[in-house]
Every structure is written in C-alpha cells, then in structure tokens.
Amino acid sequence: MPAPTTTLLIEGSFTELADEFAQYIDALRKNEGASLQSEVAPLIEPLRQQEQSEEEPDRKQRDEVLKKLVGAAAVLNAAPEREIISAYNLLVHLVHQASNPDIFLSRICTYLAKPITTSPQFGPTLAISILTTIFNTLAPTDSSRFHVLLAIVAVIRQSGSSYAFEALKPQLAAQLPTWLSAWELDDEDAQKLHLAIADAAQASGDLELAQTHVVQALQTIPANESSSKEARDLAVRALTSALKSPAVFDFTSLTAADAIQALRSSDSTLFELLEIFTADTLDAYEDFIAATPLETISGGVLVDGAEALQTKMRLLTLASLAASTPSRSLPYTTIASALRVPVEDVEKWVIDTIRAGLVEGKLSQLRSEFLVHRATYRVFGEKQWAEVQGRLMVWRRSLESVLGVLRTERERYIRESMQAAAEEVGQGKSGDKGAKGGDRRRNPQQQQQSQPSQPQQAREVELVGGAE
C-alpha cells in the first residue's frame, strides 16, 4: 500500500457524473427493480441549475444523491472485471464531494470486503487495488483511513494470500503506530484493528506477527473492563497462543496485562501454568500436568499443544540451568537429568536452545560438557540479584589476585633494575680509578687537566646513590 497521496483525475461536473453512474448501475441491474436514474433525477436537477448559474452547490442535496448512489453500489461487485476499478474510482470521486465523505466511504469499504463475483481469481487483487486508491486519496490524519485499512486487511484474510500480506507488512511495521496516533482511535477501534491484523497474519501463516497483535489488542482493554467476558476470551486466546508458539519465550508483556491478571480468578489453572512457564522448570511442569491434565484447563484450549508445551518447557529449563550455574560449565549428565532425556540427545537440545536465542555457548564433546557464554534470565528477582552478587564477588577476588601478582612483579622489576643500575655505576667507578693511575704514570700534565672533571663524577655517583 503506497504512502503518497493519490489524486483521481476525472472530468465532468458532479451532476453529469452522478447521472452517468446511475445509468451504469441500471445497466448492471438489467432492468431489475426501479430505475436508479429516475430516482436521482429530481435530486440532481436543482444541483444542475446551481452549477449552470455558478452558485455554491448545496452539499446536503449532494448527500441525498450520494445516499441513492452508494446504496445501490453493491452491484458493482458483479460488474465486468475490466470495468470494476474505473466504476469504483468514479464513485469514490463523487463521494469526496459530500459534506462528510466518511459516512459513504465506510459503506464502500464494506462492499469491497465482499467477494467480487465476476472475478473469483483476481477479485481480491482488484479489491485491494481499489481500497489502496481510496486510502491514498485521504489525508494522512483522516480517520476514514481506519475503515479502509480494516477492509484491506479483511480482503487479505479472506483470500489467504501470503503474497498480499507480505506486501502489507512493511507498511504496518513502519506506519501503523503513526497511523494510530494520527487517527486518534479509541480503545475499541484500536483493538478491532489489531485483531483484524492478527487474523490476517494467522491466515497467511505468520504466527509470530499474529501473536504480537493479539497482545497489543489485549493491552487496549481498560483495567475496569479486564474481568468482562470479552476481555477474558481475548486473554485466554493471547495466553494459549503464546504458550503454544515456538517463538515466544518472554511472557513479560502478558503478565503485565490487567486482563491476564484477571485470569487468576476466572481461569486459575491456566494462570498457574503461565507462572510455571515464566519462572519454573520441567519438574514443576510435570508435577502440575500430573495433577491437572490439559483437558481440564480452560475448556481444553491447550490439548492440541501438549508436545509443543513440553518442548518449550525443556528449552526454558535448560536456559534456567545455564543462567544459574556458577562455574559456567554444564556436564551432559546434569542437562540430561534436568530435561529427562538420554545423554546422547543432550547436544540436540542444547542446539535447539541456542537457536531459540536463550543461551550462547560451546559444546565440548571431549569433556562432555556445555560451556556457557551467555544465558537469558527468565525472571530477575531477589534470587537472581544474589547470584549476580556472588559472581561479582568471585570476579572481585580474581581481580584482586591478579592485581597482587602485578604489584609483586612490578616491585621485583624495580628492585632488580635499581640493583643492576648500582652495579653498573660501581663498575664504572672502578674503571675510572684504574685509568687515572695509569695517566699519572704516563702524563702528569694530562692528569692535572683531567682533575676538574672529578667533582662532576662524584655528583653523578651521589645521584645514583640517591636513586638507590
């Protein structure tokens, strides 16, 4: 769905085009029922006179004409395939001249959301094309765009076309928050739109995006309505799809919703299961299932997901195990025991957990252990803070030990350097004395010339000694 605004270029006055459209509708009806042209003719005549005298048109009179035209426009879905787009474009052009186009556009969108009978194969494509044109003829802040987008999503859902939905997804990702803000939708309409997108995503096979919009729809429920039947049904839908989804491991957004919290009373076993998936391990899950079979939870909404639930619980258990181990090394036997799987299957489960983004690390087949580099904390409370504190203390002691070694080595280096320097100075002094004795024997005059340099040599020795 393109972003730029579209302008329809259609020649003719309102009365001429309205009369032409009425004739076209009559032709599609094939003389069934009263003539639309004869019905609108008395309404068009005053408007034609205003156009001829160049007076300001009576918009209320136009609205009366448009009520007749739009009311009969459902028959356009039976128009020849090659004429459908141009016929709807003409109607949209007329509607934009109403005092309040929103009233008529929402009804046109309803027509387009229904099947185009003359083109079963390309009907959805034609409908989306027309709806896209309508969407882009409206100002970005026009709330009528909401109804048009709903119709587009409905057509995509009914068609089940993954291609059409893939074309819409970039616009939803980039523009939907802006649209919702610009249209100033109330909670009910925002929820309606999110659920429509979720249904279209699910029909197209994008379960992850469907779950995202179900959760966003859940968040539109006010706190004072969180215990209503509608809120309960939506909360159960959101929670069950999240539990069964192979891509959802973080339940924070769900537990924060008032409607989910209200399940404590209405669906206590389902809420208890959520708490297990949020923070507990496979042991707790198996104990829970033994006492509360899936068939008894909220009418059996999770019965078809038994295998998916157990798989997810194993991955979450391994993530918790990796996050809580102090040594960052997990033996295969420990993992096998925690996951209730054979040791030879451990590597498969570790790889699946890595793919899920819950842990990072390295498998050591020689040592039969998993070396943990990073692990995701499923919850972060007092226990986790204590673990962090313990690890920080270990790192502190390690750093203090390293610092102590560095200090010792530095002191040894300084001491040895100073000792070596002192030895060099001592050797240099002995050499100077031997040289001076030989000079006195060979050349007394040269001895006298070299005497002034002695105080400087003495000062150098003192400086070195001072350094010692």
Curated annotation (Swiss-Prot):
One of its GO terms (molecular function) is translation initiation factor activity. It holds the Pfam family PCI. Disulfide bonds: none annotated. Keywords: Cytoplasm, Initiation factor, Protein biosynthesis. Residues 40-61, 419-468 are annotated as: Disordered. Transmembrane segments: none annotated. It is found in: Cytoplasm. The keyword Ribosomal protein does not apply. Residues 430-442 have a biased composition (Basic and acidic residues). Its main location: cytoplasm. One of its GO terms (biological process) is cytoplasmic translational initiation. Residues 206-377 form the PCI domain. GO terms for cellular component: eukaryotic 43S preinitiation complex; eukaryotic 48S preinitiation complex; eukaryotic translation initiation factor 3 complex; eukaryotic translation initiation factor 3 complex, eIF3m. Residues 444-457 have a biased composition (Low complexity). Belongs to the eIF-3 subunit M family. HAMAP family: eIF3m. Component of the eukaryotic translation initiation factor 3 (eIF-3) complex, which is involved in protein synthesis of a specialized repertoire of mRNAs and, together with other initiation factors, stimulates binding of mRNA and methionyl-tRNAi to the 40S ribosome. The eIF-3 complex specifically targets and initiates translation of a subset of mRNAs involved in cell proliferation. Component of the eukaryotic translation initiation factor 3 (eIF-3) complex. This is Eukaryotic translation initiation factor 3 subunit M. It comes from Aspergillus fumigatus (strain ATCC MYA-4609 / CBS 101355 / FGSC A1100 / Af293) (Neosartorya fumigata).
